[in-house]
A protein has these predicted regions:
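Structural preference for beta-rich elements and adjacent junctions enriched in aromatics
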Residues: 20-330
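Hydrophobic h-region of N-terminal signal peptides that target proteins for export
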Residues: 10-18
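Sec-dependent signal peptide recognition
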Residues: 2-10
């Protein structure tokens, strides 16, 4: 376990060093303006999706409930589609209305710092589409400016679609221009460890401007093939992190392969151990197949990790059960 943590920290060092590399999202032109309804439609199909939100503190990724976003622009302003994983959709905290302190509920917070602007803009949207905004950090509710947000609740997620005119942002963007941005999430349904998450790996709070990500405007559209490659590049750090976990699980099991295989074989022949032996055997086989795949997707890696938590510990516990069973037989 210590080895895994060390590898993880090495992977994250570039993000943790103040003033060093920032995360960057390339914001491409939308071919058409999306219909604001919180749903993903054709207008978004060639815009890359980013994920890999960090738990506030910048050292760990959110694993149980991730967040995804797409961001594109047109001459009139910036559009965003943000999707929040939420299997406990009925437990959402989202009642406040426009202008109220939405960051206290299940919500998304957006921070934009346009190039050469004197201050940044802070916007918030809750899971029912209510809006809130301020300039800089005042913490005071304000009458929402002229920007739009619409929410949608699915079976195991909620989403918001947002349009922010350049007039609200204080200036228009141009090709190659870099703004600073933070996209953050307030999660009230648990786990408590993921209460505050954000796309840039911020340390102490969402207003940590010095560690915001870059939003780089690109004055062209993307083909579907280009979109896929850019999406892979954006999410490469999170993908690498998941690969490290999967490889670590495999190494842990292979170290005790002989003992574990023997325990599983024994357990399959015992009625009271058979169910767990089958589970562990199938899990091991599934892990092996996942590793053999040339390029498993990010979602496949994460799904396996979430589906089989505490895997090495379960194998160890089962091994002990088998040893005890054999002792009683004697």
């Amino acid at each position: 376990m210590k080895g895994k943590i060390l590898i993880l920290l090495i992977l994250l060092i570039p993000f943790l060093l103040l003033g060093e590399e920032r995360r960057e999202y390339p914001c491409y032109l939308l071919r058409e303006a999306p219909i604001l309804d919180g749903k993903e439609e054709k207008a978004w199909e060639n815009i890359p999706e980013a994920t890999g939100f960090f738990i506030l503190g910048g050292e760990k990724y959110a694993m149980e409930k991730q967040t995804y976003f797409k961001c594109g622009w047109r001459k009139e302003g910036i559009y965003l589609l943000i999707k929040c994983e939420e299997p406990s959709i009925d437990k959402l905290s989202a009642r406040l209305k426009d202008g109220e302190e939405l960051y206290r509920e299940d919500s998304i917070e957006l921070f934009f710092f346009p190039k050469d602007a004197p201050n940044y803009l802070h916007l918030a949207v809750n899971a029912i589409g209510s809006r809130w905004n301020e300039i800089g950090i005042t913490g005071q509710p304000a009458t929402p400016w002229n920007w739009q947000a619409k929410a949608f609740m699915g079976k195991d997620f909620w989403a918001v679609e947002i349009f922010i005119p350049f007039g609200v942002l204080g200036r228009k963007a141009s090709d190659g221009e870099k703004w600073l941005i933070n996209i953050a999430r307030n999660l009230n349904t648990g786990p408590t460890s993921e209460h505050f998450t954000c796309w840039p790996p911020l340390r102490a709070g969402f207003h940590e401007v010095q560690n915001f990500a870059f939003l780089t405007f690109r004055e062209r559209g993307l083909s579907f093939e280009e979109k896929g490659k850019i999406e892979e590049e954006i999410n490469k750090p999170f993908y690498a992190f998941l690969k490290v976990i999967v490889e670590g699980l495999w190494r842990d099991l292979e170290k005790q392969a002989g003992s574990y295989r023997e325990a599983i074989s024994y357990g399959l022949g015992k009625e009271k151990l058979r169910e767990e032996a089958n589970y562990l055997n199938e899990t091991w086989n599934e892990l092996g197949k996942l590793r053999q795949r040339e390029n498993p997707s990010l979602n496949e890696l994460r799904s396996f990790i979430l589906k089989y938590p505490n895997l090495p510990e379960r194998f160890k516990e089962f091994n002990y059960k088998v040893l005890l069973e054999k002792l009683f037989e004697e």
